[in-house]
Amino acid sequence: MFTVLLVDDDPDVLELTRIFLERDPDLIIDSCSSAKEALQKLNHKIYNVIVSDYVMPEINGIQLLKTLKFQGIETPFIIFTGHGNDQLAKEVLNSGATFYLEKSENPRFQFAKLRKMIHDIALKQRREEHYREQNICVVIPAHNEEKLIGTTLDSIPDYIFRIYVVDDASTDRTPEIIREFAQKDARIFPIRHETNQGVGASIASGYQKALNEGMDIAVVMAGDNQMDPAYLPDFLDPIINKHVDYTVGNRLQNFEYRKGMPQIRVIGNALLTLLTKIASGYWQLMDPQNGYTAITRRALERINPSTIYPRYGYCNDILVKLNTYGFRAKNINHTSRYNIGESSGIRYRSYIFRLSKLLLKDFLWRLKEKYIITNFHPLVFFYLFGVISIMLSVILGLYSLFLKIAFDDSILTRATLSILLLFMGLHFVFFAMFFDMEQERNNGR
């Protein structure tokens, strides 16, 4: 059951609101006619939500809300008023109210909206209680994030059991700020790298600590406050409900995000997404460079944090390992916060080249581990024959071109054979990719 305290000095409105809300069997309604009476009740009883009028004698709705905040009472609070305007709405929400609702001439509509707000709060509270039953941690890699690390730590929800902040040899005030927050919040556990090891190594350190302390789920969020904690339930629910083992963010559904990206980054992101699909075998995933992720303890133990690539590219490396060992992954659409003082340490030209080499190495390792050693699949031959055919096609084509230029020799026969080899090679490769896609679909069932 969900308990609601109504506060309104108008007895008719109070009674009408009570009657309407009591039609919902999940709600238990209590009421009082003044803020003073509400404060007395709150000294003896805990409610799940408070619905208060704004204009009341002696103490108005906002003053009641501020008094409760001062007393440390964080009960969700809805201002329900007939004296509304945009300025008041802004003041109410800035004061910490959960929702703001104006009374209208259509009682059925306004009470239905009020009930929906109450149900949204109830759902959120039940969700958070469910999360508290799990040992959920957040790993935050931080390198020279003095501007935003404090804001990031402040935003972590209460249902997160542990926060591992990994300082990767920062040279600014980042370590000092982390220590200050750790003194105020017992959930925060600082980890310090004396030498810069890379963002992948920082996350691996956090993952290892999470395993050592028995965490059930480990979430990764950047230290620059770009990753909105409001999306955490979307990342956690598929894992808690045992639908997947790994969730990874997808910003590419957001048009504003794509619109604001430099052209070189758009092209680079598209190329790396394609290469990661091929290398990892997760053909349905988008935005593999996204660092906003959540992973189960079981998956984390299997991939072994110490084997994670230490620099940028770690997220692609993790995907390859997860697919190789048969874990399910899912994209979570979300928006990110930009232009808040963050800065990127990625040099995209060198990053794309370096990551392409890593993906080739990981791809060959996955084929060996997954389709030769663990469970043999003929797609390995398709890839092999495809690559050999394409290479022979290129060599034969170049040789024919050389003969034509050097000796004016006829190239028709050789060119035809080269083209046939090319098409045959592409067919082999595409069939191999198709079989790989089918493996992913079967793994997701």
Predicted segments, located by residue:
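Helix N-cap/capping motif at the beta->alpha junctions
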Residues: 31-40, 61, 171
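Acceptor/aglycone-binding surface of glycosyltransferases and processive sugar-polymer synthases
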Residues: 189, 193-212, 217, 229-312, ...
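A conserved acidic beta->alpha catalytic loop
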Residues: 167-176
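Two-component/phosphorelay signaling modules centered on CheY-like receiver
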Residues: 11-30, 155-159
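Receiver (REC) domain active-site loop signature in two-component systems and cognate sites
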Residues: 56
